[in-house]
């Protein structure tokens, strides 16, 4: 899902920003659905996706109702612009050639998604102004996704330790290489 907004002044909530589009927001609605504008930053995998789930990035207050939107849009919906960029950890600086699209076969990628009056039909809108539920979604996402990243180094230690133990049990340290 597309969660990370550019944010602007981080000491202020969405409704307090000088530019209201620094957080994705509802700009209009009609009998068919809602229209959203804003942006989502650091979106890995979005260029390879068929659908994008838009959701808030921070806890919201009652003043932020227009920014309390969760919905699904096709990745090629009208009004979406992708500003493609490379990830800081890719290896292009070490590779030969003049191609500048990352590792053409397996490279990582990241994009800024700019939303300009992107339409979301009502059947794909999951939160519409209910700021209380948007905040709960952010918290759940944090619990399941963001916190799992903190554990990756610890998991690496466990895997390395297990591999070293298996090597010891199999006598690898005593074998000529």
Positions of PLM-derived features:
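Alpha-helical interface subdomain recognition
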Residues: 146-177
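FAD-binding core of flavoproteins
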Residues: 1, 5-151
